Amino acid sequence: MHLLITGADSLLARTLIAALPADVTVRAVDAAFSTPLPSAETRTGHLCDTAFLAAILADITHIIHLAPLYTRLADDNASLDEATRGSYQLANAAAAAGVQRLLLGSTLDFFAPLWEHFRADESWRPRPQPVLDQLCPWLAEVALREVARVTNLTTLCLRLGEVVDDAHAASHAYDRRWLHVKDGVAALLRGLEVEAEGWRVWHIGAAGERTRVPVAQAGEEAFGYRPRHDFAGRWASEAATSPFQLPTPIPARPIRKVVVFGAGGPLGAALAEELAPHYTVRLTDVKPVEELMAIPPQSPGAPLPVPPQSPHEWRVVDVRDAAQVHAACAGMDAIVNVSVVRHDPVDAFRVNAVGAYNVMQAAVAHGIQRVVHTGPFMLGQRGGAGYDWDTFLVDDIPPRPGVWWVYLPSKLLGQEICRI
């Protein structure tokens, strides 16, 4: 077995590498390493770099992808880009290279809204919260699930508790989310060898009656996970915790001022004309309106933007820039985001997914309740991975974006960000 491990500077990865059989060769990858890993070949770089990706996949047969769970970069945008575009590129390249299996490390924290009252197992729908440590693994799950659906790359998602070792457990108050690192390693080793195909999800919790998410389907014969650590010696140290609470809803207010992102496209141009008689409109795009007016229409008869007249205004705003988006939303009552990149494999994710994150962050920061986010029809995927075989398609069935056009999966990730 030739194993690639991303997020390899983590406690879980380091403990796994030490436990692997001698006949397994390991290539450990992360943005940086805090200390050397003498028992593995180490590479530093980013999964968004396609040249780096091609190099680290050479001769690899299996992948354990822990980067969305552990790797954080200079800012939120870079971390999200690595978790979304990086995971998407990794899975596609792995499928093309003939990798036999990919394991994704994710988190059981998705079920925090439920675990006070319910025993959530693998059949329950996750409830991720809008924080980076949940968005990154959740969006990686979404990206890899769609790649697995189309390419048949065997992909196992292991949602883990909070991985700790003996030293951490001895020096901290007991937390019911804990998962002993040795049990996490045992689950990963099991994931490398069990019979599986397509996309599968397993919940990897601790042993004992106190754990937040008890072992369910992962403990059945098909996967055979048997945790050994219940932290019983630390139960008495458990501190009181507040029950999960949803954020306070943003109150509604009259909508008089509207900011539009992506106003230079045909949809944005038509929208500006419709909004102008009724609202004060701030139109934004990545280029000045005069420059966009000089570009031929996207199709015959498609509308072009025109310079707005007072009290309306045009601002040059790049949705990839969180500070610019935040400033553009100041004083606004509603947001319409029609920004889009359809073909560029880099900016499709940076605009359609990370840009959506910037817009929603700005909406929350400014107390804007109404956000309109546009996206494509995602139900026309051809072949067995889509709904090509059916004729009765309703609006709320799960999307099937495929993987051949970056426009669709990147927009799906943006929609997930907005939903969360």
List each language-model region with its residue ranges:
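N-terminal Rossmann NAD(P)H-binding glycine-rich loop of SDR-like oxidoreductase domains
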Residues: 1-22, 250-278
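Alpha-helical substrate-binding/gating segment
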Residues: 160-167, 178-201, 419-420
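NAD(P)H-binding glycine-rich loop region in Rossmannoid oxidoreductase-like domains
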Residues: 43-83, 312-354
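Conserved Rossmann-fold NAD(P)-dependent oxidoreductase catalytic core, especially the SDR/UDP-sugar
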Residues: 89-128, 358-402
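Conserved glycine-rich Rossmann-like NAD(P)H-binding loop of the short-chain dehydrogenase/reductase
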Residues: 24-35, 279-291
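Glycine-rich NAD(P)-binding loop of the Rossmann-fold in SDR/ketoreductase-type enzymes
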Residues: 48, 78-89, 97, 131, ...
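Conserved C-terminal active-site "lid" loop/helix of NAD(P)H-dependent oxidoreductases
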Residues: 201-202, 207-230, 237-247
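Active-site Tyr-X1-5-Lys
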Residues: 128-155, 402-420
